[in-house]
Amino acid sequence: MFPAKITFKADKTLEQRMDVLKFVTLSSITLLLGLQSAGGFAHDTAYAPTPSNQRAIEFPDTNKYKTLAIDLHIHSVFSDGHVWPNIRVAEAQQDGLDAIAMTEHLEWQPHLADIPHPDRNRSYQEAAESAKGSDLIVLSGSEITRDLPAGHINAIFINDANKLINVEGAAKNSTDTEVFGKAAIKWPAQEAVEAAHKQGAFMFWNHPNWSNRETSGITKINTFHAKNAAEGKLHGIEVANTHWYAEAAFQTALDYDLALIGTSDVHDLIDWDYLPHEGGHRPVTLVFAKEKTAASIKQALFARRTAVWFKNLLIGREKDLGPLLAASLKVKSMKYQTDTVIAEIEIENTSDANFDARYTGPYSLGLSSDRFQLPAHSTTVIEVKPGKRLKALELPITLENTLVTPETHATLVLKAALK
């Protein structure tokens, strides 16, 4: 049966949901009330309070590019999600995102009887209309949904989602989820990929390590995806989705020159799934773009200039992550304690990451170990004992909550000097 093969996230229990709701912050409540007062229930422009520092995802620009936080895998009631698209816009505004893509399943339509929509562009149109007047960019997209070998593939920057699905006969107008779905997946996945490619879509392989798709639970690229990657029809791969990170997917990205993608794949509320009111955050893709426009985001994605922010873990190629780390961590000052040769070095972290640092230099630190934390959006003073007063010091560090390969952490040299 179609629903048994195409399996999606299980619903939380009522008790779990009620427990989470008890802790929803005032800003989240204000968001929902604001939607009502702003005509949100008529699907008008979304309203969201100004994002707080505790919730907004913030990373500095690098010396060459703007750092944009985007979520390229989102669902609404127009497929198997449980909210209207304007709620997705409001959530993204609360999270301080720069762009989102509405990516409804084309074939899996559990709400079809209640929300029939022969035009599969409606989710994007609703979200784009809701975001008018804000600086949030809404991108068009769809999720091509099949069993292996294709699995699930997101196509972003499409012009017409209707051309990515082909249902023939009586099933075309059916509101029965199973009847429609079984008919929809008969159209070869490769033809859907070709249709998206003709529209200039950026395509990436979704949640490649799902155990119900690959029995080992380990990402293994198959002939279908390898061929499309070689032909320039597969451009990225999710290395993080919802609550998992797949190191094998990271290695696949490196081996096949695919963009690193991290997504929420949200179906319920962001507040339920990621608990931002308790310090959590949705997984996002950090795109290093020349400017904040849809065209620039598209260019950066095709150029593979991305990193992933997932559960306080930064994942990226060294060429992309290095400049971001250099922009995030800077030495503000250096001085010596009175009548000593103990240097105090003040390090500022302007990013959302709570960096777990390990000092790898030759000097002793005024700590119990060579490991220390550099908390997000704060300044930390580190004592260094060089043995004599030097005008300048270098602090080589390894950042253990970063990955530039599946087994390698990023390194950075902080340079301090007396003024």
Question: Language-model segments: which ranges?
Answer:
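A metal-dependent hydrolase metal-coordination microenvironment
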Residues: 51-202, 206, 232, 239, ...
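Aromatic-lined carbohydrate-recognition surfaces of secreted/lumenal glycan-active proteins
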Residues: 201-217
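Charged catalytic cores and adjacent phosphate/nucleic-acid-binding surfaces used
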Residues: 41-70, 85-89, 151-158, 216-419
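Bacterial N-terminal signal peptides that target proteins for export
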Residues: 6-27
